[in-house]
A protein has these predicted regions:
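Conserved NAD+-utilizing ADP-ribose enzyme module
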Residues: 1, 9-15, 28-41, 86-89, ...
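ADP-ribose/NAD+-binding catalytic cleft of ART/PARP-like enzymes
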Residues: 1-85
Length: 197
């Protein structure tokens, strides 16, 4: 059993109906978050890697910003937004967490909104607007260890392939993390694009 910490303005009705989905799907479909962003004049064209704020287009192809020697504050934020959408877009969950309130503010608003809020004046405090209309929830779901991305448990894909048969390394990392007082959080990345709850 894994769990996702989220926030919702409709008592998770959308999640109950459609399940959990990755960020790309959420920004491409008629979802509560997507409608909220549109009401705040923010839209996304995922395929073209563009974000529109008040009809001004912003390039969020994070790979374009990777090798720049000098990067402006705005380009750095666009890189971070693009990174969330095109690299770190999967469903995130916890296998265990000692205290979710110590982990971050994800119980108040999606991390993506916080990243977005740092871009410019038009997006400033978008995360606080969301927080003011939503309540926090914990959504539990069943998932097999094979459903999690290899980098949840392994330092490299090679390490994963080597351990795939017996999973001893993965299991030892799970046990070590569970019993460690210093890192009592295990945050897996779910490879599926959606999860039924």
């Amino acid at each position: 059993v894994a769990f996702q910490v989220t926030s919702s303005s409709n008592e998770c009705a959308e999640i109950k109906k459609h399940g959990l989905h990755n960020l790309q799907w959420v920004l491409s479909n008629d979802t509560t978050l997507n409608r909220f962003l549109k009401n705040n004049n923010i839209t996304f064209d995922i395929e073209s890697k563009l974000m529109y704020i008040n009809d001004i287009a912003y390039d969020v192809d994070y790979e374009k910003y990777n090798d720049l020697d000098v990067i402006s504050k705005r380009k750095e934020q666009l890189h971070k937004i693009g990174h969330k959408i095109y690299y770190d877009f999967q469903i995130n969950a916890f296998l265990f967490c000692k205290d979710i309130y110590d982990y971050s503010t994800i119980h108040e608003a999606p991390e993506f909104l916080y990243t977005l809020s740092l871009l410019n004046k038009a997006t400033k405090e978008i995360d606080l607007k969301w927080k003011n209309i939503c309540k926090p929830y914990v959504v539990k779901f069943k998932s097999k260890l094979k459903d999690f991305a290899y980098f949840t448990f392994y330092g490299s894909e090679r390490e994963y392939i080597k351990d795939r048969q017996d999973n001893w390394l993965m299991l030892s990392r799970l046990v070590d993390t569970f019993f460690s007082r210093t890192s009592w959080t295990m945050l897996p990345y779910v490879e599926n694009h959606s999860i039924s709850v």
